[in-house]
Amino acid sequence: MKKALLALSFVLCATLAMAQYRNKDGNRIGITGGVSQTSLFNSNFVTKPGIGFNGGLSVRGNYYNNWSMIYGMQFFQNKFSIETTTSSLQKKESEFNIQGAQIRLLLSYNVVKNHVSFDFGPVLQINDKLKTANSDQNNTITGTNLKAVQLEEISKVNGNVYVGISAGNRRIRAIVHYQYGFTNLLNKLNSEEDLVLLNNNTKFKGNLGTISGQLLFNL
């Protein structure tokens, strides 16, 4: 996982450097950072959204008339809670977190040039395991016979759809965007028949939905 993230970082940095070198006026390199709220949409568990964070780099280039393209990568940590039952039979919202990197290629329509844009496109997500606190790992997922720790091995490569809007000037912009995961984050769990049985003999299905607020600083 770490090697993959380092490779992705190298590719992005090299691409951004080349873009800036080739056309300093047409391309803008930006640094972003912000907070996110993530929900796990599924019919297996009782869940609640949680607060995470993200940050990364991007390059915006002129494309055609009022259209631009954005290529970027960001690192993220998303969080959400799943209702569990402790060994003392107490209900508890156990927090889970997922970390990884995303590569996105977006089309951007300049509603007001250099000030307001509408952005959309696909996102490739590479993430680590689904993790929870050591103290919660043996809690039972409400409505199932699963232990929290048994949800760790999720799908590592996922795809999202990105829709967002940004507003500001050439140097600083505020960004609000939403991502929906169109792939099944929990699909890898379906390869383990024992886990499916513990899940009431029901296939696992879960899609992430994340809304983020960010600040972008153009170099």
Give residue spans per PLM region.
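Bacterial Sec-dependent N-terminal signal peptides
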Residues: 1-28, 32, 215-219
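Membrane-spanning beta-strand positions in outer-membrane beta-barrel proteins
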Residues: 28-30, 68, 106, 115-117, ...
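Glycine- and aromatic-enriched membrane insertion/assembly motifs of diderm outer-membrane
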Residues: 47-89
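Extracellular/periplasm-exposed beta-strand and loop segments of Gram-negative cell-envelope proteins
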Residues: 39-48, 77-99, 126-162, 183-193, ...
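Helix-adjacent hinge/juxtasegments
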Residues: 90-115
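Outer-membrane beta-barrel channels and translocator barrels
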Residues: 24, 62-66, 112-116, 170-172, ...
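Membrane-proximal, glycine/serine-rich, low-complexity loop/turn segments characteristic
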Residues: 20, 116-121, 125-127, 175-179, ...
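Residues on the lipid-exposed face of transmembrane beta-strands in outer-membrane beta-barrel proteins
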Residues: 31-35, 53-61, 73-75, 103-109, ...
